[in-house]
From Swiss-Prot:
GO molecular function, one term: melanocyte-stimulating hormone receptor activity
Organism lineage: Eukaryota, Metazoa, Chordata, Craniata, Vertebrata
Protein name: Melanocyte-stimulating hormone receptor
Extracellular face of the membrane: 1-37, 94-118, 184-191, 267-279
Glycosylated sites: 15, 29
Cytoplasmic side: 64-72, 141-163, 212-240, 301-317
Organism per entry: Felis catus
Amino acid sequence: MSVQGPQRRLLGSLNSTSPAAPRLGLAANQTGPRCLELSVPDGLFLGLGLVSVVENVLVVAAIAKNRNLHSPMYYFICCLAVSDLLVSVSSVLETAVMLLLEAGALAGRAAVVQRLDDIIDVLVCGAMVSSLCFLGAIAVDRYISIFYALRYHSIVTLPRAWRAISAIWVASVLSSTLFIAYYDHTAVLLCLVSFFVAMLVLMAVLYVHMLARACQHARGIARLHKRQRPVHQGLGLKGAATLTILLGIFFLCWGPFFLHLSLMVLCPRHPICGCVFKNFNLFLTLIICNSIVDPFIYAFRSQELRKTLQEVLLCSW
């Protein structure tokens, strides 16, 4: 792939010596209204990335260590941790290499830097796609466990889970390769945005339906104990709060990135859209933050996993 300047990339470029430079095909010399540009210090970005790496490595180690966690649900959580780990590692690696290039501490031929850029971009894009896929897979798994509880173990078997996991990884690698190869096509950006919207709708529909079932179940229990309102309202408020946090964090962390992609299609040269483009480094930081939060939402709430995690930490000392 030929070098086309510092902003030729879908997910950033090592040809730009500043890690805070606009990415995703931005017009660097746009003129227009005064914009609010929130820069993220390199040290903070690298620090968040390292925190995410440590957290997700611990999740993978805990699930690998405890055989009681070798079930489809925890395998999906483990794969989500691996995806978040790859997002963090690749983003930190890209920023570190760019800083080294800027400082002159890393010298290399343009072809070598170009090849490394290609590899990192495919890794970042594939990890993002797989992370979204496994968030959807976890939602589907929980939905089946609630609405088909008696048949859950016959529906979600280990072979089926492994086939689903393999399909997600293969699809993520292939799609990310195509996305990077055809980064300058509008269809690529539309596919990414459509994929995000589909995952958001899927998760919202499934979790809202699960909340409705939980409230219905609570009403049934309340009638038996003749205290309908307190029990039902308490569970409903708790469930609604949990749902709001889960979907809110997902949308807050991923939404700006895909808004960025949408505006690239709708108004790539409009001055106001250019103001959004200048904050891409912040949007990538939010995705790293999502990788930090995911273990707390999906993994650390399990008492069995927390116990195993303590054992892993004690063994490491």
